[in-house]
Amino acid sequence: MTYTGLMQASLDSGNIQDGSYIFEKMKDICAPNLVTYNIMLKAYVDHGMFREAKELFEQMLENTNHLSRNDDYKMRVIPDIYTFNTMLDACAAEKKWDYFDHVYQRMLYHGYHFNPKRHLRMILEASRAGKVTFLFFFLHIMNDPL
């Protein structure tokens, strides 16, 4: 059985602490891949552990700051669209609009784009919370042909 399988089994049974422990121990033996990071991130979010999810996400973002050679892509895990969507959902659920903006800006920086079906609900929630700049920014994006 793999570390990811053990971690997933712990998380599926609702045991976040054991899943997190396995994830951390895995780093001592082998490098977790993107799927493993996303599984752990989603588990933190699903169990209301926003701070832990944010820390893990920031670790992934930090990895992108250390990419200088092609070989670095094999050793470091960088966020994908699933990672960004998971964090955007978490920010919206927790009403962390300033961090939502940070995550969204990083998503754009990494080459992922606004998805009206996926993100519009969150943008409207942010604008209702007084983050009017989000609404204007996204309306501009939607009206700006590529």
Task: Please tell me what each predicted stretch does.
Residues 6-14, 20-26, 41-48, 54-60, ...:
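The core hydrophobic/aromatic register in alpha-helical repeat solenoids, strongest
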